Amino acid sequence: VVVIETKAPEQGRLQLSYKGDFSVTMADLTDYNLMNSSEKLQFETLAGVYQDTNHSMANQLRLDDLRNERLKGIARGIDTYWLNEPLRTGFTHRHNIYAEGGEEKIRYGIGLSYGEVQGVMKGSDRQTIGGNIDLIYRTGKFQFSNKLTLDYQKTNDPAVPFSEYAQANPYFKKYNDEGRIDRYLYYYQDPELLETEAISNPLWNAHLNNYDKGDQFGFTNNFIIEWFVAKDLRVRGKFGITHATGTTDTRLSPLHTDFDDLEETEKGLYTHSTTKRTNYEGDLTATYGRVLAEKHMLNAVAGFNFNATKRTANGYKANGFTDDQFGAPSFANGYPEGGKSTYSESQPRAAGFYLNGGYSYDNRYLLDFNYRSDGAS
């Protein structure tokens, strides 16, 4: 066993340290070799996009008019670059401060950290807060140590994926002639078949009251006691507890184009989920090692350990929102058709003990013994 300890601070003095990290992140779009508007229209023409496969004269005239209309727009200079819309320059900063001190028998340390990370996607960010308390106390043949860490994280993610911007055609305009965002880049409904062709505008969905956010909180506490019974015998006990809670909430506005084909009482979607996890673990170990007559080496390790974990998860979905701004689940009409709230729970446990022994004579003849028993539920 190798034990490494950091250099102790000067007795009776408080030592402070600070560390800061700052960075700037930008998206690399060199791998996106997308066609311009003229190239894309030519590609679609060669691919038969503007050819009616059912040999309908009326529909062929419509497709010809559609291609000519897009060709006129290209001639007027329409060549839209969509990839820059959801992107930004991300700034990140992290700070960590740690204070430590102590005397001959006791050492302590207190730390605090804070960080903000901006993603290159607009609406993508992460905030982290952490803390830790370290204590070590020595008296006689005993040493006590305790380490507590706490972590909190808050996240936000964009509701419209980057792929929707990459798939938008360059011959479409981002805004209409009045400078407003249209719901669709292209919309057509067949008057006879009542079939609809629609291409949604990613800027429309992005400006709605959508969100995808979450927060997590957790802590870990480890307590260790060591008893140096004799030069050849040491007993060590450890008990630890870990707890973590996570919550996620996502919401799509009833004005989102995903709900265009649904009834008013089914538009919009709110999703909530919560997870909890608590873990207890401990072990007790006795270690013995001795050399007799410079040739006989004896060593033995005996121990007992246990572990218990409880996990729970619950969640639900709600739909039927009547307004873009009213996003709380209390404004929903109810569960989606066939939907209901969910809940799950599990509690695995395990325990075991072991005995390892060894004998060596003159570093030439070796004898090892190992025994272990485990149980779990």
In which residue ranges do the predicted regions lie?
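Surface-exposed loop/interface segments of Gram-negative outer-membrane beta-barrel transport/assembly proteins
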Residues: 11-76, 119-121, 130-220, 236-351
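Outer-membrane beta-barrel initiation region
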Residues: 31, 53, 85-90, 99-103
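Exposed, low-structure sequence patches enriched in small/polar residues
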Residues: 238, 303, 356-360, 367-370
